[in-house]
Amino acid sequence: MKKYAFTLLLLLGTSACTQVTPPPVVERPPAKIAFALGGGAARGFAHIGVIKALEAQGITADIVVGTSAGSVVGALYAAGLNGFQIQELSMNMNEDQILDGSGMYQCVVETVVSNKRGCIKGQALQDFINRNVHGLPMEKLGKTFAAVATNLRTGEMVVFRSGNTGMAVRASSSVPVFFEPVTISGQEYVDGGLVAPVPASVARSLGADFVIAVDISDRPQDKSTAGITDIMWQTFSIFGQTINRHEQSSADIVIRPVTYGLPSTDVSGSNKAVLEGEKAVAAILPELKARLAKLNETRHVAGMP
């Protein structure tokens, strides 16, 4: 009996001394957030309001991808300017600084009458961007940045990630008829909105864990067609609907500022566009915060790198 008691005591002692070490809890790096900023000409000022409102909530991007007007704002943001600084810059900007001195209506008339490839070279826009990013190439900006353009010969999407920042933005923003195509390394490029109106899939391909897309495009039924420029933008809107739906399926959340009624070709409505961007973030903020919180929870997984 004593023998069995002694054996039991040894077993209990061994059990008490043996500790099961739980698997280590390894925290993954913070989720990479991307802003996918869509095209929309002068309505692109709404991107500034979106960025301002997100920054106020502590939400910033690691990756920025822009199409057309989105590439303009995106380049400035990736270079380190915050939303307020970009807005201040936009308030002191006039059309001549980015349109080579041509008004939009005059531009279209000149192009059609003279059969030109575009009445705006885009050099002023290129210089404006390079001046405000301090001449840094894309790969040297503070955040990962990409600008989306369309190869005019093949119709394929091209994603610029390195090289002259202003030139890439110029290519991404070269709306046909208004801007001349941009030649880079022997290839001609036009507005990226033809292939990726809201470049969410590109943001995802660059390693984003969470993509916040900003859609500033007009719905066709919301557009006036009172003149030739209106008809052109209406055509772009119709053309981009299907592509836009496909692109937005790659986003985790889509912010849609109310931009219908805002002119596509007049920068004078910039303050209203900024305000609409801020309002759009406020409307979707509860859902956005909930999704980000859920994403962060899943990154604290026991025993996983």
Sequence positions of predicted segments:
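Gly/Ala-rich beta-loop-alpha elbow adjacent to hydrolase catalytic centers
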Residues: 66, 70
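Bacterial N-terminal signal peptides
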Residues: 5-15
